[in-house]
Amino acid sequence: VDRHGPRPHIDDRATTPEDFATLHARFNFSIDVAASAENAKLPRFYTIEDDGLAQDWTGERVYCNPPYSSIEPWVEKAHGGGAEFVVLLLPANRTEQGWWQRWVEPFRRAGTLEVEFLPGRMRFLKPGQPVVKPNERPPFGCCLVILRAPHTGVHAPPAQPRLEDVISDIEGKAA
């Protein structure tokens, strides 16, 4: 949970049916691990009461639009949950934050996950709202973070080279 605590007005927003249909046609998800009964996009889903973080994701084709006030546990679980693959829909404007630097960037550099920045700004449904109002978009773009087996069983970021080694390599190539 972020420094402000849970934020239901943000955390309970749902992917629009149109955007989800595009993703589902591409990935054929088997479960939505961060849903509510009102916004679930698949027949199989976990709600906050089910605690998707505590569930076994082994062999699943996971869709996850996590609560944006608590992203890190979901990204960490994606690495260690044993799923066939996990697609996380995340805000693209938080690449400086610790969770991104711990759980996305090192794996992206190592080539063990994909980051796909989505064009424009997605729309999200508020609880009880059947359609998104015109010009109602979040103030940020989104991205997909995609992890595929066998990298969904990795529990720690790959080792980073020591700064001294990088400098030595650069100096050696310049000589």
Region locations from a protein language model:
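Class I S-adenosyl-L-methionine-dependent methyltransferase catalytic core
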Residues: V1-A175
